[in-house]
């Protein structure tokens, strides 16, 4: 298994155009933090802020996945857009790209909730299964990718499981930072009122009612 090179992380620029210096809010508490621990937390916060603005670098450093130029462009442009539509050729890797983006956002943003919707529950579960295989390093064509860092952040609520739930209500997982991902089925009446980011896989085949409820 290829391990993440810590030298790459240490060589990150100290300041980035999207960072605001060292203006990090420190919540006052009953037990004051030592200056050494506070300095360590600030380094982590600056690292998080840098990667939030550079998702392609994050995917390369933490998942060891080198995207194609077109894929990297899609990730960078779609990263902070409220609505994104991808129209790509067959074999572009749309579903895999979606999964990589979900994994990156789950790790970089706290309480990031994502729902995967498709025309049928099985199709959404297939997209989820690809994400699960990425986390378990079970995709032969992506030689050298490392999903162990992402998998280590998944909450394991059942001692006999690995954190990935395959319930009849939808496949799901949650991270320690509060991020959550779940698949949706075609029963739209049970999904009204849910809040979060929705990913439509093969959205061209969804009916109007499903699009209006999920969106």
Which residues does each PLM region occupy?
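Phosphate/NTP-binding elements of NTP-utilizing enzymes
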Residues: 2-215
């Amino acid at each position: 298994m290829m391990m993440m090179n810590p030298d790459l992380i240490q060589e990150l620029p100290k300041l980035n155009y999207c960072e605001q210096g060292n203006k990090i809010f420190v919540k006052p508490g009953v037990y004051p933090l030592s200056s050494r621990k506070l300095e360590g937390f600030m380094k982590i916060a600056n690292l998080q802020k840098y990667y939030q603005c550079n998702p392609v670098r994050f995917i390369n450093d933490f998942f060891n996945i080198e995207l194609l130029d077109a894929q990297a462009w899609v990730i960078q442009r779609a990263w902070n857009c409220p609505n994104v539509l991808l129209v790509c050729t067959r074999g572009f890797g749309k579903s895999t790209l979606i999964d990589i983006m979900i994994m990156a956002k789950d790790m970089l943003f706290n309480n990031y909730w994502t729902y995967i919707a498709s025309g049928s529950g099985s199709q959404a579960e297939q997209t989820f299964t690809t994400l699960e295989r990425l986390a378990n390093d079970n995709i032969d064509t992506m030689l050298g990718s490392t999903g162990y860092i992402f998998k280590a952040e998944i909450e394991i609520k059942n001692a006999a499981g690995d954190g990935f739930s395959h319930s009849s209500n939808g496949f799901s997982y949650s991270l320690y930072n509060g991020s959550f991902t779940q698949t949706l089925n075609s029963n739209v009446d049970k999904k009204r009122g849910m809040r979060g980011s929705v990913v439509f896989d093969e959205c061209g085949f969804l009916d109007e009612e499903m699009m209006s409820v999920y969106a």
